[in-house]
Amino acid sequence: MCIRDSKDNCLYSPDVISFAREKGYFSGANKDFSFADAYCPLDFSGLRACEARVWSYYNMFSKATGQAYLPYVQGESKEPMPLYVKPDRKLSVRDIQQAMRDHYEGTPLDITQDLGAGPFQMPYRLSPLTFKVDGQEYFNERPISTQQSAFSFVSQMRANLPDAIGGVLWFGLDDANMTVFTPVYCNTDRIPASYAEGEGDCVTFSWNSAFWIYNWVADMIRPRYSQMVEDMRTVQNELENTYAYAQEGVESAAMKLYNENPEKAKEFLTDYTNMCAQTAVDRWKQLGEFLIVRYNDGVRKLVKNGKLVRPATGNVAPLERPGYPEQFLKDVVKATGDRYKVKTLQ
């Protein structure tokens, strides 16, 4: 695309091409200028750590596009992906929230099935992105959801409502996969206490900090991911579905207040924003307490109707010992031979 022909869609410096020539980034005719090729030529790291994440969204919502550009993200084709695509269906806020939690599951880039996933199909890889073995460089996949995210959000904008009500930031701290997206209305003038500065910092844990509470729970789950993640998902869906279900009623009430006095609507939505954030953090603390009790020391205590089962007598809760997944045990035996074989003593 020639940027000079797209002034309604592109904002750029008058010297965007001449500066590239001056720096040696571009030497062709103006009509052939590519901003991306000049200022950020694609290398393997950019392809696999950045472009592949875009591909994952396309693959989720436009299957034909995903299939067509799989060779591109695998480094087998140089045909770049389109800037945007039309999804196969109309997407909801919940669709985008769930997409933010993707780790390439079910695709050729899935990282839950190889040795790096550990025994419990952990869809994460520790940084750095690359490593060397015997002088050869290798890489770790970088999916949409990663553990080092500080925050993520889905921005919802609706022209059929006043700006004060129509703009909502569905905001979550830490890894998108294991956070709760809570509504933050754009007219909010008071930051939720658990989101604000002053509660903990980069070297100080705080039970009043949403960032640290979400990190605490996520770091508990990752090492035993396949065993523990569904307990987290149950609470996450419970909260997010509640916020989604309540949205229409909340905004209807806000609209009535707005028509009376916009300041009343602001106060109402500010209180609601703060309440949702605090409710999620409080529930996440309860989740963390539940997880550490249920999965203590590698066992799994039994649950009935969402509650841990108490012993009929004594102080040992009913539990099971799930151990390691069968495939992992087979891999151990394959790697170690008879090292751990139980022998019959003569």
Identify the function of each model-found stretch.
Residues 1-6:
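Conserved small/polar residues in nucleotide/adenosyl-binding loops
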Residues 9-238:
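Structured mid-domain segments that build the active-site/substrate or prosthetic-cofactor binding neighborhood
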Residues 173-179, 184-346:
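Charged low-complexity "KEKE/polyampholyte" interaction tracts
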